[in-house]
C-alpha cells in the first residue's frame, strides 16, 4: 500500500547503513525520537520482552540531525591525502574500532574511528582481474589509475601477464600522481615500508613484476628488453617529497655505509654499479637527501627543491622496536611531508601508507 507519510532516508556511518525514518517531526530532538519500550524477540505470544537500549533514542536522533545538517559540496578541494592501511578490510576496521572504544572504557562496538565522522564515505572494489585473493600491487594500481588489473603488476593493464616485460610497454596506465604533476600539483609519498614496495610504487612505477625493486631481482632478458627496475623509475619520477625505507635498492653492492638509524649495515644490492641517490641528487642542486630522524626534524620546511628520505635499508622498524633506532615514525614523516608540500604549492597530493 502506498503511504503518504513523510519519509526521510539518509546514510550514516562507515558501513553506509541506509536508514529510512517515517513520520518523525521535523524538529525531532535527541530525547524525543524514540521512547524506550519493550522489544520482543519474535512475534510469538510467548516471546520474551527485552528492554530497548537506552541509547537508541539519542543515537538515531543524532544521526538524523547530522544528516539534515549536511550540505552539497560547493567548492573544489585544493589538496588531498590518500591514507592506505595495508589489508584494511572491514574486519580490520571493525577490530580497530572495537579496540579504540575499549581503550576509552566502553564496550567498543559503538565507537567511531576518525574517518567515520567525515560527512561522506564509500566502498571501493579493488579486486584483481586474475585471482580472488588480491595483492597490494594490483589493488593499489586500481586505486591510483581507476583500472583493475592483474596481481603482481604495477601501473599496467590486465592484458599483460605478470613478468612480461615486452607486453608491459604496450599497456601503461597513467596514475593519479602523474596526472597531478601534469596539472601543476606538488606530490608526495610517505610509507614505513620500502619506498619501492608495491603500494607506494603504484604511485609512480609501471612494471609487470612488483618484485623488480632493484635490478638485482630482474632477469637478464628483462634488462636487455629495456624494462627499468622500480628504484630507477622513482629517480625518473617527478615527486617532490619521498619518505620511507628501502635504501638498499638505490645503492651498489660496493656501498657499505652504516645508517645512523640502526638496522645494521646499509649495504647496497644493485649489480649495475649505479648509485641512484647520487643520480637523483644530480638532477637539481636544490634537492635534499636525508637518512635519519634528526635530519628530518632539522629540515627546513621551506626548502625549495625535492626531498628524498630513506631511513632504513629495508622496511622501517615496527613501533615497539623503534626505540633503539633513529628512525622517524609514520607521524613524523607525514607531518613533515605536509609542511613541505604546503610550502611548495597551494595544491598538492600526498599518499600515506
What function would you assign to each model-found segment?
Residues 2-14:
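Bacterial N-terminal signal peptides that target proteins for export
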Residues 12-13, 82, 177, 334:
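Hydrophobic alpha-helical segments
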Residues 12-23:
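Bacterial N-terminal signal peptides
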Residues 14, 31-33, 352:
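N-terminal low-complexity/intrinsically disordered extensions
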Residues 28-305, 313:
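N-terminal catalytic scaffold of extracellular/periplasmic and nuclease hydrolases
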Residues 293-353:
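Anion-binding catalytic surfaces of enzymes that hydrolyze or transfer phosphate/sulfate esters
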